[in-house]
């Protein structure tokens, strides 16, 4: 349990049975009246943002979140099945939770998931990943007048703008935060 004075940005609290991540915490002390805490909260499950006000001295329960390293096994319908790399337990993760992250992970790769009481809340991708180019326009000798890139489709289905010298079958490194080409490997 934490009091209003200990609440900071980044904490995950349980309020009215729901999990909320503190996006912003403003401690307000007025000249007259009691101090209060105004929180901008994001519901961890629904991503809805709300602003709530609490009186000074109120206490909150902190959610005990854990990070687990998992391996992507396979996809079936609207779920991917992953395996905890420490306990070898297998469990499904909703594709809706992963959104665009599926474009950066392949079968048998590992990544971290954030869990609360065995419920997967979020995933954490590495800063960059290696991918193989499976489709792109051919490179023509002397075709550098435009100076721009060309679209390339990777083995996961992600379309990335790459320099004109990148060919089909080559390995590239892609930034997972913005989906941009970093380098050829």
Curated annotation (Swiss-Prot):
GO CC entries: cytoplasm
Gene: efp
Cross-referenced HAMAP family: EF_P
Coiled-coil ranges from the UniProt annotation: none
Superkingdom, natural source: Bacteria
Locations listed in the record: Cytoplasm
Taxonomy of the source species: Bacteria, Bacillati, Chloroflexota, Chloroflexia, Herpetosiphonales
Organism: Herpetosiphon aurantiacus (strain ATCC 23779 / DSM 785 / 114-95)
PROSITE patterns xref list: EFP (PS01275)
Name of the featured protein: Elongation factor P
């Amino acid at each position: 349990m934490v009091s209003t004075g200990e609440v900071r940005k980044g904490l995950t609290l349980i309020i009215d049975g729901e999990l909320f991540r503190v996006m912003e915490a403003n401690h307000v002390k007025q000249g007259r009246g009691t101090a209060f805490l105004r929180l901008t909260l994001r519901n961890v499950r629904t991503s809805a943002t709300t602003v709530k006000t609490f009186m000074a001295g109120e206490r909150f329960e902190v959610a005990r979140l854990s990070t687990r390293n998992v391996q992507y096994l396979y996809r079936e319908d609207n779920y991917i099945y992953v395996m905890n790399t420490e306990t070898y337990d297998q469990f499904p993760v909703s594709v809706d939770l992963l959104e665009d992250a599926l474009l950066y992970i392949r079968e048998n790769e590992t990544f971290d998931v954030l869990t609360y009481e065995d419920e997967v809340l979020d995933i954490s991708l590495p800063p960059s990943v290696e991918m193989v180019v499976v489709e792109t326009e051919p490179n023509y000798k002397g075709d550098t007048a435009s100076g721009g890139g060309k679209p390339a489709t990777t083995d996961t289905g992600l379309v990335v703008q790459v320099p004109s010298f990148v060919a089909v079958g080559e390995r590239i490194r892609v930034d997972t935060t913005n989906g941009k080409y970093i380098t050829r490997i």
